Amino acid sequence: MSESDGAFKSPSLPPSHHAPAPMSPEKIRAPAEQMDGPVEGVIDEIETAEVQAEKESKISVQAPALHYEVPPWACEPDPAHKFQFEILKEGKLIASYDLSNRKNSTFVVIGRIKPGCDLLMEHPSISRYHCILQYGNDKMSKTGKGWHIFELGSTHGSRMNKKRLPPKQYIRTRVGFIFQFGESTRILNFVGPEEDSEPEWDCSPTEMKLRKHKKELEAKLRAAAAQEMIDDEKREKEEEGCGWGMDYGEDEKPLTTVETDAHLMEDREAYYNQDPKKALQKFFEREGFDMNFEFSEQGQGHTHKWVCSIELPVEIDGVDRAFTASATVSTSKKDAQIQCALDACRILDTYNVLRKSNTKLRMQRKTLEANDYYDEDDDLYLDRTGQLEKQREKRKQWAEEGFGHKRTETDTYESLCRKLEESKKEIIECQKHLDELSAGTKKSRTIDQGGDVLDDYIRQLEKSGGAGDDAKTKMEKSKWRQKLMAATHESQKLEKLVKIAKPAVVKGLEQLETTAANDRQAFLKKLMGVRARKEIDQTPSQGPGPSTSATLPATVAPTSTKAVEVEHEKKMTPLKVEKEIAASLDSSEIKNSLPAVDEPSSVKDEVSEETPQKEAFGSKVQKRVAQWEEELEAEKEELAKKQKLEAEEEAKKKVQRVRRRDIEKKIAGSEDYGAGVEDRDEKYSTWMPPNADQSEAKQDALRAKFAGRY
């Protein structure tokens, strides 16, 4: 290089190397302007459409084949029904996808690969073809059409309503369901018409859990019963031993099949689901037993529960088996009883003994009639409570109702009174037994005065109720209390029936009979007095001697007549009096017709003086008797009218019912303060302050009257 060269010369480049193309000022200026922004934004700005097209041409990604066959029940959805997915992220709606924008006619593909998927999800945990949403006929209900989700066996799976979906199965989806795919946090809400939504539950989630738990218990119970039957059969076979050919030709009894199908059990439950207690009562009446529930309590306060149990006498293949149904309820005692009856009906229906066929019932009725309605195991000699007779009556009634000739008993007033007396005697007997049990308990708890102080204290605690009765005494007391309660209820029922069946009594009829009898006796007494006076008057003329009545003083004669009347009243009955009156009348007439007998002159004079007096007295008696009869008839008529008026007044009182509503309206409408109150003057002060219209004189008078009081 020479010094004369004034400028620096750049070295020459090989011909194969080309100089870089000059960049446009816009491209050079862009990084300087957006240096503060994110790097991705800068890269997106730098890359042009030509560069992206060049990349796509260089990188060729071929979509894999979708291995999915459309089922035969698939169909196209109705265009009028719009279904879509709402995509939520962190509780916010970020996007939505309409299912009508699908590539296929009947299904939607959900996945991560763009060319072959309808709904594109970019999370790395989502498979290329993740799942299929297929539209078609509803396979479960066969009543409509809808969408079904089909998991394609993805690596991280899918969840519907927070439950993992099984692979390669069609699951019916409803409007309102939510979906999650892979490990993505985005939630897809399925939106559509209300007709496709799931029906609401008829119970709460807690009740659903209880139902599920109950079904599990029933399944365990059925399994345990089946296992017990198998064990019993094995035990019987082991105990049989060698038959020696004695049972040759005998037909084996068919085994009782235990029904375990849930759908069949639901159909059969319709018989006793509405009223299980009534269905169970029919079973016990048919078997001839009493339905006795046993109750017990558990816990206290908010943990208090009622436990109800009942023992079921079940005969399976000729073998008596005892099952116990129980139920625990925290609501009430009645609910526990109903639930226990429902469980008992289910157990009996499982072994097909709750409802027997008509042929078996007819054979059972004939067998009972042949055995005089007694069971084969009944022993009257050992029965001391009369329970066997009651069971026999129940069996007899049930058998007669089954044969068609139902026995109807009509109770009368006398039969009801007889039954009432018997129930009262039963109440007294039950109370007597209870008193004897209580007295025996008290006697066993008596405290000895001697001994240790600690022993006395413990006995005192036992006496006060610390220990209580033993189990046997409690059972006896409970049994007699139940009998007492049943007898008491029966007595109350019979008392009501006796009041209803009591013959009607006509008011005034008894009074009329008593008054008529009293009037008859009074009339006969008066006639007796008349007869006695006649005899007294006739006594002097019977003998030839002088008259003793004339010699007696005037003061003695009335007393003697009264004494004679009293003696005659005591000695003579009404029938005898009537006969004597008739005889006296006949004898007087006969005496008048007889010829006269010669008598002394003094006697004739006395008789001649007394005869007009006797004739006048007889006419007076007849008039008085007729007057008495008229008075009696008038009194009877007045009494009948009075009784008729009283009956009419009572009928009016019954018909005219005073309505309290009218009285309240009348009281409310009245302007008086305290109207309608009996002691109004004592409870209410009716004084009112003076009005402006009153004169000054009245106001001054009132001020002077109440000065110093107010």
UniProtKB/Swiss-Prot annotation:
Record-linked Pfam families: dsrm (PF00035), FHA (PF00498)
Task: Provide the FHA domain boundaries.
Answer: 108-165
Where are the coiled-coil regions? Answer: 206-240, 409-440, 471-502, 613-661
Renumbered to this chain, the Low complexity biased-composition regions fall at: 15-25
| Keywords recorded for this protein, A-Z | Coiled coil
Composition-biased stretches, type Polar residues, lie in 538-560
The record's region (Disordered) falls at 1-40, 230-250, 535-560, 591-619, 671-710
- Single GO MF annotation: mRNA binding
- Identify this protein by name: Uncharacterized protein ZK632.2
Q: What is the lineage of its organism?
A: Eukaryota, Metazoa, Ecdysozoa, Nematoda, Chromadorea
